[in-house]
């Protein structure tokens, strides 16, 4: 019955579109990338860009499927696999009547006369993000989105397997080449869609033109599994540049001043400078990113505006040290330290002789952030130039 209802619903949607003068070829769908990877430095707002698009186009939650790749991701966690499933079974007597708890059973009164239910374990096919999105796309004319976070942290060849062939789309937005579905997937899809559905015709899989796959990739991540060129060619790529953050209205559009300029967010680091003012987050980012670029000759390790979160436009001292400085020390300075640079020294307790800054120096004996040392480091950053390097 469910297969029939979904088929009827799809036909009704198609008829409505035709009455409106909208055909699949006219749809905005092909203007939206079918497969696109948003990439850039951490904190540039890659995931937010996707969310903005989905919100702006009123994509319903039932048409959005999410997953995150990691080193242990594989075909089973992305597509589906047989797994043990906990099920409930009623007990029946010889007459086919459910057996209930008796009054003299040593149970709370709430279960008195309730049917007895046994829990058993059975094996069944459990679909994951890809297959859930695939089924949904064949059940509706609406655009369906499969979102993959951190795609380069997993072994894409292992995760996609033979689905790799489906990523090659034709001019109509559908897979140029179909693949034979495994017996388990074929059985599952025939149960969900019906054996005559285009999504499993002749036991073959084919991506429809309303299924979009969008992914994010941090260029700073040290990928355990590099993405090969053949896989890359099947995606559109969108670079998200590091930029200042700007205010937006409820409609998602940028707010502008009287002169038509976008209004900056104006985040601050909740650490005082020598004049008693908080440090400007964007000014710090511009300077530290120029240092990182000098160290690494690359933008990959640089920080985006949304690398950490601000509360009431302030980045707390704890967040700044535990997230920003920890990242710099662990992922940048450790491998790309500047020899004899003034960036890593400070004068303690008014001493004339500078000493090296190590990460533990950012905390006092009680484990609280030492604001004065953090301020010294920020001052070093703001005053740094490549002439400091010998």
Predicted segments, located by residue:
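C-terminal regulatory/interaction module of P-loop NTP-utilizing enzymes
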Residues: 1-390
């Amino acid at each position: 019955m469910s297969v029939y209802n979904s088929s009827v619903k799809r036909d009704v949607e198609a008829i409505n579109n035709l009455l409106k003068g909208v055909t699949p070829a006219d749809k905005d769908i092909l203007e939206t990338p079918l497969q696109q990877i948003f990439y850039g430095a951490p904190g540039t707002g890659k995931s937010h860009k996707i969310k903005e698009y989905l919100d702006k186009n009123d994509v319903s939650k039932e048409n959005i499927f999410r997953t995150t790749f990691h080193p242990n991701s594989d075909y089973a966690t992305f597509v589906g696999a047989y797994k043990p499933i906990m099920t409930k079974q009623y007990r029946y007597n010889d007459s086919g009547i459910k057996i209930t708890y008796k009054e003299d059973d040593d149970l709370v009164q709430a279960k008195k006369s309730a049917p007895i239910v046994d829990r058993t374990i059975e094996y069944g096919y459990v679909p994951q993000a890809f297959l859930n999105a695939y089924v949904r796309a064949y059940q509706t004319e609406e655009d369906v989105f499969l979102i993959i976070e951190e795609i380069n942290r997993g072994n894409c060849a292992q995760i996609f397997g033979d689905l790799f062939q489906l990523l090659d789309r034709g001019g109509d937005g559908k897979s140029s080449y179909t693949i034979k579905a495994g017996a388990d997937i074929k059985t599952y899809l025939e149960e969900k869609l019906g054996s005559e559905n285009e999504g499993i015709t002749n036991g073959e899989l084919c991506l429809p033109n309303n299924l979009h796959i969008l992914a994010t990739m941090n260029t700073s991540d040290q990928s355990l599994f590099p993405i090969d060129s053949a896989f890359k060619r099947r995606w559109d790529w969108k670079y998200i540049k590091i930029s200042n953050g700007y205010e937006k209205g409820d409609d998602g559009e940028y707010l502008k001043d009287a002169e038509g300029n976008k209004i900056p967010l104006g985040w601050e680091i909740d650490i005082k400078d020598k004049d008693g003012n908080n440090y400007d987050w964007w000014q710090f980012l511009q300077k530290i990113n120029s240092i990182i670029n000098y160290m690494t000759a690359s933008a990959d390790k640089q920080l985006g505006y949304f690398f950490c979160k601000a509360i009431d436009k302030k980045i707390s001292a704890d967040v700044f040290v535990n997230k920003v400085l920890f990242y710099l020390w662990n992922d940048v300075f450790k491998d790309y330290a500047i020899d004899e640079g003034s960036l890593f020294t400070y004068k303690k307790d008014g001493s004339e002789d500078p000493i090296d800054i190590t990460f533990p120096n950012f905390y006092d004996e009680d484990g609280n952030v030492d604001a004065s040392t953090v301020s010294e480091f920020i001052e070093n950053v703001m005053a740094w130039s490549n002439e400091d390097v010998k």
